């Protein structure tokens, strides 16, 4: 496969046709989620009947519930150093990763990605590095890692890929409509002259402008042109990776991907594994039950009057007057022949429709593995133990989703850490929002200073940075400024530089709910009992390590931060025998000055008792 228009269009066609059924299924589920499942003909029929297009949206109900649940799980990306000498650098890298997540407002963006994964089965995010336009004092660019949610309907996948994280794919296509101004900004003014506005040259339904926008943007005085652009990333037969922007028969932009360790600028994670080429979300088996509920609601609307009257010809003078009087709560209805009128109760049919709804909801809960206790709808007579067991059963059944979300976070964190290591080369100060200790600031790439050989007027030695030619992190070539001068940058202090450190990425998942109260109580009992007291007296450093392990098992929002503090304290005590002795004495209840407790002290005597 080569990075030319012919191969790109062929791979697009192959990928689209391979996953066409999955795309249509995902669109149907999205329509159910957004209450767009009624066609125009069906809406017209309901309007003629005077019925509302009512629905009990189960897809949206459980989507919000699952997204809300996973929002309570704090997935913390942890970069662990491979070499002990990189401990300080790993701390700075973790702070930089946290800054990137906060800067991209991932608390909101992450919920959007998780919703897309639940509905369509694809968790997708674009990860790019952009130049902020700012420069440090030495002229080096200050870069920023940027996240962007990607709708699954815009993506075309490689059918040869077999990995759930899409790591073995040969290509990925993303098509999107861009405004005229955006095209000029990205590709130049001449590109607009070579393109046709509102032309779907891909010949696929999802690529129609009206698919997501309903109509073309036409104002009173002008038409706002939009153009269909495809962004393709691929690996050619020589192992080189390319980023290609093309439209119809025009290659707008073709560049080599310079990310050294991240393969694609897109992070993909499929929610389910399958033996055929498909992807789907958690609501595949729920869709038909959702339609059954909607149909039952429509029938209930037709049965809003629980009685029907069968009138024989000639039994009443005026059928319209009879209808009006019959529908009144209290009415005197004149008739000619009472035997020609039959009243039939419809309550049986109404109960049947409610049974359909109840059974459908029960099937949906069983398919999703979600019980009433997890939904907060347990019976008041249920014991707390029963509720906890049922909630734990739901959490176990949702593990297949939890594992894929954690895998996505780990892959995204790994991409972020590697991009930071490659592109964050400028001297900059980053603010880290820490809810425990408040805001903190870290300085990346702090210049190493050397003695300049002179003193200032106050007798203080003058320092200067050690300058060397700066290398472009993308191309590996010597950097030059706008005037063609070589950019000289300082050698950085090793503790503040991330360029040469080695790390591994893991995920610390902590759910701050109270599902493990019993286990937490048992741990607290051990820590505060005789074993814990003896441990604090004999081995204070080990006691802090035990406390860190106990805190790690507690699913609270601040568990990772408290665990880090406890581990730091244990390390401090382990390397300082004097501090360890003082901690042991404090655990024994030592008095000031180190004097032992008096053995002659007794409880005060009760004056009402006789003296023995």
Residue spans for each PLM region:
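C-terminal anchoring/interaction modules
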Residues: 1-49, 125, 134-140, 162, ...
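Extended, helix-rich architectural segments
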Residues: 1-242, 352, 356-359, 445-478, ...
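Generic detector of short, locally flexible boundary/turn motifs and exposed helical patches
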Residues: 42-44, 87-93, 205-211, 258-260, ...
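Catalytic nucleotidyl-transfer cores of nucleotide-processing enzymes
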Residues: 239-327
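Short, flexible segments with low predicted structural confidence
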Residues: 68, 88-89, 264, 335-337, ...
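Generic signal for short, ordered secondary-structure residues
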Residues: 72-80, 96, 104, 272, ...
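Sequence/fold signature of self-assembling virion shell proteins
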Residues: 226-231, 236-273, 293, 517-538, ...
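Helix N-terminus capping/helix-initiation residues
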Residues: 57, 66, 151, 177-179, ...
């Amino acid at each position: 496969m080569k990075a030319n228009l012919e191969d790109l269009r062929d791979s697009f066609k192959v990928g689209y046709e391979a996953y066409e059924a999955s795309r249509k299924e995902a669109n149907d589920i999205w329509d159910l989620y957004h209450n767009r499942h009624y066609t125009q003909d069906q809406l017209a029929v309901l309007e003629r009947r005077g019925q509302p297009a009512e629905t009990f949206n189960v897809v949206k109900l459980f989507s919000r519930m699952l997204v809300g649940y996973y929002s309570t799980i704090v997935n913390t990306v942890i970069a662990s150093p491979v070499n002990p000498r990189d401990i300080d650098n790993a701390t700075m890298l973790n702070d930089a990763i946290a800054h990137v997540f906060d800067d991209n407002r991932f608390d909101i963006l992450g919920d959007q990605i998780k919703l897309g994964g639940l509905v369509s089965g694809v968790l997708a995010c674009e990860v790019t590095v952009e130049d902020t336009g700012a420069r440090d004092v030495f002229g080096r660019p200050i870069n920023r890692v940027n996240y962007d949610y990607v709708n699954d309907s815009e993506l075309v996948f490689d059918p040869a890929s077999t990995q759930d994280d899409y790591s073995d794919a040969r290509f990925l296509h993303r098509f999107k409509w861009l405004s005229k101004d955006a095209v000029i900004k990205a590709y130049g003014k001449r590109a607009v002259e070579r393109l046709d506005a509102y032309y779907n040259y891909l010949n696929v339904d999802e690529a129609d402008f009206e698919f997501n926008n309903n109509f073309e943007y036409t104002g009173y005085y002008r038409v706002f042109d939009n153009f269909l652009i495809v962004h393709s990333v691929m690996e050619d037969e020589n192992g080189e990776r390319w980023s290609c922007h093309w439209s119809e028969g025009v290659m707008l932009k073709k560049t080599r991907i310079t990310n050294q360790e991240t393969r694609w600028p897109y992070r993909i994670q499929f929610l389910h594994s399958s033996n055929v080429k498909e992807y789907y979300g958690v609501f595949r088996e729920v869709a038909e039950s959702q339609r059954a509920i909607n149909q039952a609601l429509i029938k209930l609307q037709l049965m809003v009057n629980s009685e029907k009257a069968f009138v024989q010809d000639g039994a009443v003078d005026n059928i319209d007057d009879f209808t009006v009087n019959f529908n009144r709560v209290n009415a005197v209805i004149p008739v000619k022949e009472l035997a020609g009128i039959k009243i039939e109760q419809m309550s049986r049919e109404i109960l049947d429709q409610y049974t359909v709804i109840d059974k459908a909801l029960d099937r949906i809960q069983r398919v999703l593995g979600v019980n009433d206790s997890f939904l907060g709808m347990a019976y008041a007579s249920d014991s707390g133990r029963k509720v906890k067991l049922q909630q734990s059963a739901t959490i176990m059944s949702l593990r297949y989703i939890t594992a894929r979300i954690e895998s996505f976070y780990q892959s995204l964190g790994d991409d972020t850490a590697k991009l930071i290591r490659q592109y964050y080369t400028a001297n900059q100060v980053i603010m880290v929002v820490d809810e425990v200790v408040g805001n903190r600031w870290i300085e990346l790439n702090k210049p190493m200073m050397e003695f300049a050989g002179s003193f200032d007027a106050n007798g203080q030695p003058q320092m200067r940075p050690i300058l060397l030619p700066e290398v472009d992190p993308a191309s590996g070539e010597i950097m030059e400024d706008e005037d063609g001068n070589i950019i000289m940058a300082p050698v950085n202090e090793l503790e503040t530089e991330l360029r040469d450190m080695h790390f591994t990425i893991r995920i610390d998942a902590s759910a701050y709910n109270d599902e493990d109260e019993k286990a937490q109580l048992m741990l607290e009992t051990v820590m505060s009992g005789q074993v814990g007291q003896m441990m604090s007296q004999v081995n204070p450093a080990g006691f802090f390590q035990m406390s860190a392990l106990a805190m790690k098992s507690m699913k609270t929002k601040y568990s990772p931060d408290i665990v880090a503090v406890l581990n730091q304290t244990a390390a401090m005590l382990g390397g300082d025998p004097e501090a360890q002795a003082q901690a042991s004495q404090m655990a024994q209840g030592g008095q000031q000055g180190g004097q032992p407790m008096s053995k002659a002290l007794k409880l005060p005597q009760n004056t009402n008792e006789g003296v023995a």
